Each structure stands twice: as structure tokens, then as C-alpha cells.
Amino acid sequence: MALSASLHLRQSQSLVMTPQLMQSIQLLQMNHLELTQFIAQEIEKNPLLEVQSPSDEASTAERGDSGPQPEEAGSEIDEGAGEGDVYDSATSRSGERLSDGLDSDFANVFPDDTTPQRADAPELLGQWKSMPGASDGESYDLDDFVASRKTLREALIEQLPFALESGSHRLIAQYLIDQLDDAGYLHADLAETAQRLASASEDVTRVLDVLQQFDPPGVFARTLGECLGLQLRARNRLDPAMEALVGNLDLLARRDFASLKKICGVDEEDLIDMFAEIRKLDPKPGTSFETGSFETIIPDAVVRTAPDGGWLVELNPDALPRVLVNHEYFAEISRSCRKSSGEQIFLNECLQNANWLTRSLDQRARTIMKVASEIVRQQDAFLMHGVGHLRPLNLRTVADAIKMHESTVSRVTSNKYMLTPRGLYELKYFFTASIGSAENGDAHSAESVRHRIRTMVNQESADAVLSDDDIVDILKKAGVDIARRTVAKYREAMHIPSCVQRRREKRALARVG
């Protein structure tokens, strides 16, 4: 068969994952900290990007510019960009001029083009901003003027000159101090430490024995039993019976009191006294010291009560990055560059990337607003009455309601938080599995059922401990159709012991009390 060359025309459509589209998808699932770091990197690479400072916002407010009013949950949001958009209107117009030259259509990525809502929630945001580390820099917090507490490392180093005189021993001690975790436990291998410091193993062991006498008692322990033993020794309470107890903490965790009485050689009354002594100890002695900076969770959305009794859903302005495109700088540089030069090509690419980024951030804010509003509409009973009234909800229900893809909702709810009158919750918290009703009524959420189980266990007495079958019967009377194995699974997930172990523990605690 002879080979021949021919030319054929074929028309087809295919989905192409462009770099801009990948960036938009990544922005959706970033939390506030990741987004801030990403924007800082983009600003370093793109000279046309800038972040609006709080002083610029204040001057804008003095000129009379105002943002849009908050929308009530479940209400329609006006189409198009308004005067109170998060980003500069010039940026949006420039983005529209460049959209024809991009590989992807924004309508395919973000089907909705509604405007994000920005407003202040005085009550809830005031509570959140009063937390340490949540200040916006415009007001003073008395906590900022309080002297910071000592860290565990500083407290231990202060005790070194009074305990160790040898310079080599102090070097070993400083190395061991650096190996402590925040709880005060030592995870370093002594043989490896001796080899690394070119010291004798006996010297390392001798230094460790001295360090284990430092305050707070229990530091430099390698296990929980050793930590409790060090604290008991400091109280002069480490007798053979107590030493046997801390050496068999696994039996204590299983509530195997009969075996503990036999191993410790004590009667039930003495064992109860030993339990009371153990309860006074600190399993993490290092946590009482300053451990460094804490990462403050910044809510992406805020929910507060509306004047008419409904709910107002607002985006947290502190979580919205104010990224703008400097068109004046672009025009000034363009006048001094030839159109075909490499500098002009670089500027055009920077302008295109900057406009894409600002619009992607704008669409991210709008998407978060729509998802948060729908969650509030679906979980209205939770906001009014608490966890026991949390409804079963899945991603598809929210996606269908806001006419977006299920994967988009999943990305938006990852690592995003909403401040409600009942506390700060991750958006994923509101999505729970469904448990059927025993009387063909409304389904119950798994989280609300777990809350009921926890409440029943907390309210039981030592003489009336509920078994899994008893919990099933109570839930069925309340209209929850649930199997015994499901109750056992929920109980174990919440680290609730079995009824036999709870009965032993409650009776022991009743005698101690």
C-alpha cells in the first residue's frame, strides 16, 4: 500500500486549563494567610500592582465614597459592578478590554457576576477585633503594653548557673533545653546527644538528672509516666505504690481498677486517694509558659441579626485584600517605551496579569459571599437554637441553590471561617451527613445527633449510666432512626468510653468528691 500525504480540516472544541484559570481555582481554596502571602509575591513580580493602605481607605471615606449595604441572607444580589466594589472600577474596565485576548471566558469560570457585599458588623467584628493579634493597627490595645511572659527556654536557662558549674555540662544542658517541645517533653536520644557533643554518655545522663529537678516539675520527661513521677517526687509522694501506678497508666486509661489494686498492693480506698493525687498533676508542664506567636483565625464572613429578625451576611473587610492596578504608572512608563520594545511587551503582560488577578480576587469574594449566604439560609435553625438544630447539608444542595459547580463550593469552604452569634465556625462545619427519621419526618444531621449523645452522657449519674442500646432507644423516641453500631461509632469518635468504663470512673470520682 502506497503512502501519501494529505491535508484535512477538522473543527472541534476542547477544554484547556490555562495558567490564568489555574490561578483562579487556586485563589478560591486559599485561606487569608495563604492569600496574603500569594499577593505579596505577585506584587514583587508585578510593578503595576499595589495594595491599598488603611490611610488611603480613610481618605476615600472622607471624600464621601461608601460601600454597599449588607444583604440579607437568601436575598438576590444586584448584577453588575457598583460604586462600592471592592476593587477599582478602572481595573474592571481594563480587564474587560483585555478579556477578548485571554484563552478563557470568565463566564465559564465564574457563572455569577454579582457584586460582593462589604459592610462592618459592629457587634461581632468588635468582639473579634478585641482578641489578641486581631487589631487593625488603628487603635491601641492594652494587651500590647503588657510585658510578655517568659518562655520555657528562658525560665530554664535562668536556673542553669545555680545548678551546673562546669562549662561542658552547661553546654549539654543548653542543647537539651533546645530539644524540648512546647509541653516540656524531651525527645532527644541521649546516646546520639553524647555522640554529637563529643561527651561521655554518663555526663549527659548526669546533666539530665539535674535538669529534671528544675521548675516547673515534670520538665525534661520522656514519657507521660516519667513526667507524673517527677512531679510526685517533687511533692515527696513517689512511694512504691504510686510508682507502680504511674508505670501502668495504660490500665488506668482502660479503667481496669481491679488490676491496678493488685499491682499497687492497695485497697480500693487507697487507690481512690491515689487517683485524686494524679488528677492534681500537670501532664504538660511547659504549656504554662509563653510559647511564641499564635496564628489568629480571621473570619471571611460575618453573620449578625438583622433589624427585622433575619440574618445579615457580610464579608469581613479585614479579610479582603485591597489590590489595585496603577494605571498612571503604566501610562507614564509606556510613553517612554517603544511599542515593539521588550519593555513595552513586559508592561503589557504585567497589565494583563494584574487585571486578571484583581478580577479573580473580586470573583473570589463574590463566591464566598454567595456560599456563606446560602449556608446561613439553610442553617437558620442552628443560628437561632444551637447545635441540636443543625440540619443535614451537602455540597450539592448549596451548589444547586447558587448555580455553581459542586467542586467550586468545596474549594470555597476549605479553610474559610464564618463569625456567627454562636461563635467562629469553619464553613465545612455546616456540612453534615443525614440520619433518617423514625417517624418519616425531617432528617437529622449527624452533628446534631452527636451533640445529643454527648449531652446524654454528660447528664448521666453513676447509678444510671446509659448503654449504647439505651441511647438508641432514647434517640428513637425523639424521632431519630439510628443503629446501635452508629451510636458506638459516634461515641468512640468523641472519645467517650463504654458504659462499663464510665460507670467505674463515675463511681470513683463520686467517692473522691
Swiss-Prot record:
Biased composition, class Acidic residues, residue ranges: 73-86
Known role: Sigma factors are initiation factors that promote the attachment of RNA polymerase to specific initiation sites and are then released. This sigma factor is responsible for the expression of the nitrogen fixation genes (nif operon), glnA and dctA for dicarboxylate transport. The open complex (sigma-54 and core RNA polymerase) serves as the receptor for receipt of the melting signal from the remotely bound activator proteins NifA, NtrC, or DctD for the expression of the regulated proteins.
GO cellular component terms, A-Z: DNA-directed RNA polymerase complex
GO term, biological process aspect, one: nitrogen fixation
Segments crossing the lipid bilayer: none
Keywords: DNA-binding, DNA-directed RNA polymerase, Nitrogen fixation, Nucleotidyltransferase, Sigma factor, Transcription, Transcription regulation, Transferase
Protein name, as recorded: RNA polymerase sigma-54 factor
KW Transmembrane (keyword) present: no
Start-end of DNA-binding region: 394-413
Family: Belongs to the sigma-54 factor family.
GO molecular function: DNA binding; DNA-binding transcription activator activity; nucleotidyltransferase activity; sigma factor activity
